[in-house]
A protein has these predicted regions:
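Bacterial N-terminal signal peptides
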Residues: 8-17
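Secreted/extracellular ectodomain signature
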Residues: 22-210
Length: 210
């Protein structure tokens, strides 16, 4: 086959959807993202099931539904690290965030301002970017992924009467050097207006447990 005929044949296959160019969208292999928005009531996410449903809804909107999406959140009886599967996890751009649960909770994880993207492939308002700063992520977790004492009443309280442990999606902020992605400081409350002053908008991490 001549080069010209080969090119024509290849283009024909792509047009028919046979070639790899149309085989899958960029979100198909995504197994990790930061939520692009809070469901609307701050730390009241409807418990873990409501938070998981929010992850699924956002993922489905960009063609990444059909996976077992889990919010990276701890409660008084559940550790975040135990509910997100075994890994590896990839962001929407195909970058591997971590190869395993142990890797995710080690200094080797690849969560950075450039890789901790939302489901649309956009970077949240991290330090040095657009304002207001929104790098705080709800986790209710310690650095090792176990439950902390602050979980917005197990993610059912969107008021000023409870608090949540927050991580920094950009790994920047409170202390010099690299900050923890999942456990840096407590919130000032669990209402959206309480999350904003320290640099948050009620976003959280979603992982595929498949």
């Amino acid at each position: 086959m001549t080069q010209a005929r080969y090119v024509v044949a290849a283009l024909s296959l792509v047009a028919l959807g046979v070639g790899p160019a149309l085989a899958q969208g960029p979100a198909d292999n995504m197994t990790f993202f930061v939520t692009s928005a809070n469901p609307g009531d701050g730390g009241n996410l409807g418990g873990l099931s409501g938070a998981d449903a929010h992850c699924e809804s956002l993922a489905a909107a960009v063609g990444a539904g059909g996976k077992t999406w889990r919010a990276y959140l701890s409660t008084s009886t559940v550790d975040a690290r135990s509910r997100i599967g075994a890994g590896p996890w990839y962001n929407v751009g195909g970058v591997m965030i971590a190869s395993s649960v142990a890797d995710l909770h080690s200094v080797n994880n690849k969560i950075t301002p450039e890789t901790a993207l939302n489901e649309k492939g956009a970077s949240p308002n991290y330090i040095g970017g657009p304002q207001p700063n929104q790098h705080d992520m709800l986790t209710g977790s310690n650095e090792n992924g176990t439950a902390s004492a602050m979980t917005c009443n197990n993610w059912t309280d969107g008021s000023a009467n409870s608090m949540a442990t927050l991580g920094h999606g950009d790994r920047l902020g409170r202390t010099e050097g690299v900050n923890s992605w999942n456990s840096v400081h407590p919130s000032q409350g669990c209402a959206l207006e309480n999350l904003a002053p320290t640099g948050g908008a009620g976003m959280f991490y979603c992982f595929s447990a498949d």
